[in-house]
A protein has these predicted regions:
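N-terminal anchoring/stem segment of glycosyltransferases
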Residues: 1-45
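Hydrophobic/aromatic beta-strand patches that form the interior of the parallel beta-sheet core
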Residues: 9, 25, 50, 76-77
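Short acidic, S/G/P-rich loop/turn micro-motifs used as interaction or catalytic elements
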Residues: 13-17, 55-59, 82-85, 100-103
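Residue-level signal for functionally critical sites in structured catalytic/ligand-binding pockets
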Residues: 36-37, 44, 53, 90-92
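Conserved strand-to-helix beginnings and helix N-cap segments that scaffold or border functional pockets
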Residues: 37, 62-63
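Short beta-strand-to-loop acidic/aromatic patch adjacent to the donor-nucleotide binding site
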Residues: 40, 47-60
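Short glycine-/polar-rich loops that comprise or flank the Walker A/P-loop
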Residues: 46-47, 73
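Catalytic-site signature of metal-activated, phosphate-bearing donor transferases
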Residues: 65-128
């Protein structure tokens, strides 16, 4: 696995899955992913960091993923396309470039307003 920092967002009243990362900070869901990111970004010390909901299974994601040179400034989002697993086009698993997020965060109204987002569809990314 990469040595990237990770942030797990804890939702109430849902199945909780343990983070596969040793260096995970768990934070409660408050208002929006963007607000959470703004509140924790100064604690992130790695070039990229994983950001994901506690109800997501990360078993099918390549946790060693490192963006290609032409994708290095993008937020990478994995989302499920299997109806049995629940769908959310905006996703609940992210790999975020720390410096680029810091550059843009004050001008974002919504996380989806980030300049460059790379959506990775996945047919077996279960959530509950």
């Amino acid at each position: 696995m990469t040595g990237f920092d990770s942030i797990q967002v804890r939702f109430k009243n849902t199945t909780h899955r343990q983070s596969p990362f040793a260096n995970t900070r768990v934070v409660p869901f408050v208002q929006s992913y963007l607000n959470i990111l703004k509140s924790v970004i100064d604690d992130v010390k790695t070039e990229y960091f994983w950001f994901f909901a506690n109800f997501m299974s990360l078993e099918e994601i390549d946790l060693d993923y490192i963006p290609e040179q032409h994708e290095k400034d993008q937020i990478h989002v994995w989302y499920n396309t299997n109806l049995k697993g629940g769908t959310n086009r905006e996703g609940n698993v992210f790999l975020i470039p720390t410096a680029k997020f810091k550059e843009q965060m004050d001008n974002l109204k919504f996380l989806r307003d980030f300049k460059d987002i790379n959506y990775h569809s996945h047919n077996n990314l279960f959530q509950n």
